[in-house]
């Protein structure tokens, strides 16, 4: 079974995503659905476990529909030895407010919450526990652990963690926005990408010279080839104030001619391009990369020594 690092302890949404990816047979070389979860105390630690060989893969959150992309994941992918995405899954996220058996809402004075979770239940807490004192947790499951060990009265956690720690729920399905979802990635050391499926995503990190028009020029490589960008986001390079790297997601696979040509052009144009992978999403997008055009077919025929077709005579 594949060793897969994830943000622990047992019972986090990340563990649930890991098990879903494994059950779907999306772990390269381990399509039997088996996985050996390896809990760690942060997302960067999960990715470092892959880099050091302590784990074969890591399952990490990349973005949620409430707060957007998760900076620790982005930064960890861009800095350090290269890693590659091989699969993804998206989970509907709703939380449980849990206490020890026999504790009621009136008894709750302190509550542990992972910062990302706290942001997604802020309105509920204001309405139902307005005077509660918030304590940080390093994950949703860690909040449940704090309740079980008597460090706090209540926690915002996952149903999986509540069951693991045998806690009682004050409320289930808690989330301020009913469409709250989180996307998770399966990441390993670089290798051959999964085969093209027709519903794929390709991602890269671009480091671009700080000159006028440089970003526009890079983005034009996608637009001129009819490639649909689904995300562009900047993060500081940490090398100096005002210097940024750009995370790009697009529809398509490196096996698509248009995507491959765009990546080659970016490699020529940018100071650095870090390929993060091409992988199946299971989602059908409106704009798929165009197939090889007539010019590409013509060029391939020349390379193969095939005669050019005679042009049609004018009428």
UniProtKB/Swiss-Prot annotation:
Q: What is this protein called?
A: Prephenate dehydratase
Q: Which Pfam families match?
A: ACT, PDT
Q: Which gene encodes it?
A: pheA
Give a GO molecular function annotation for the protein.
Answer: protein homodimerization activity
**How does this chain assemble?**
Homodimer.
Q: What is its EC number?
A: 4.2.1.51
* Pathway(s): Amino-acid biosynthesis; L-phenylalanine biosynthesis; phenylpyruvate from prephenate: step 1/1
Q: Which GO terms describe its biological process?
A: L-phenylalanine biosynthetic process
Q: Please, which domain of life does this record's source organism belong to?
A: Bacteria
- Annotated Prephenate dehydratase domain residues: 3-189
Report whether Amino-acid biosynthesis shows up as a keyword of the record: yes
Q: Which PROSITE patterns match?
A: ACT, PREPHENATE_DEHYDR_2, PREPHENATE_DEHYDR_3
> Which EC class is this protein assigned?
lyase
Q: Which residues form a coiled coil?
A: none
């Amino acid at each position: 079974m594949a060793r897969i690092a994830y943000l622990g302890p047992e019972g986090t949404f990340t563990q649930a995503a890991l098990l879903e990816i494994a059950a779907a047979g999306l772990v390269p070389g381990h399509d039997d659905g088996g996985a050996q979860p390896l809990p760690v105390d942060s997302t960067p630690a999960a990715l470092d476990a892959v880099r050091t060989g302590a784990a074969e893969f890591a399952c990490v959150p990349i973005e949620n529909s409430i707060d957007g992309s998760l900076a620790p994941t982005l930064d960890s992918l861009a800095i350090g030895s290269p890693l590659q995405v091989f699969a993804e899954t998206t989970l509907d996220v709703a939380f449980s407010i849990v206490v020890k058996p026999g504790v009621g809402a009136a008894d709750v004075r302190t509550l542990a919450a992972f910062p990302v979770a706290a942001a997604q239940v802020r309105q509920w807490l204001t309405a139902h526990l307005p005077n509660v004192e918030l304590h940080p947790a390093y994950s949703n499951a860690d909040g449940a652990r704090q309740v079980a060990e008597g460090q706090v009265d209540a926690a915002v956690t996952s149903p999986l963690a509540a069951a693991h720690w045998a806690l009682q729920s004050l409320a289930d399905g808690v989330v301020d926005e009913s469409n709250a979802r989180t996307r998770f990635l399966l990441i390993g050391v670089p290798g051959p990408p999964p085969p093209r499926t027709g519903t794929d995503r390709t991602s890269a990190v671009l480091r671009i010279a700080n000159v006028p028009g440089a970003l526009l020029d890079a983005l034009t490589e996608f637009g001129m080839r009819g490639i649909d960008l689904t995300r562009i986001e900047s993060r500081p390079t940490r090398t100096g104030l005002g210097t940024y790297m750009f995370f790009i997601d697009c529809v398509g696979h490196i096996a698509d001619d248009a995507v491959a040509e765009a990546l080659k052009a970016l490699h020529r144009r940018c100071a650095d391009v870090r390929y993060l992978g091409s992988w199946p999403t299971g989602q059908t997008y409106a704009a798929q990369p165009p197939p090889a055009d007539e010019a590409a077919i013509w060029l391939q025929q020349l390379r193969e020594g095939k005669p050019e077709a005679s042009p049609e005579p004018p009428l």
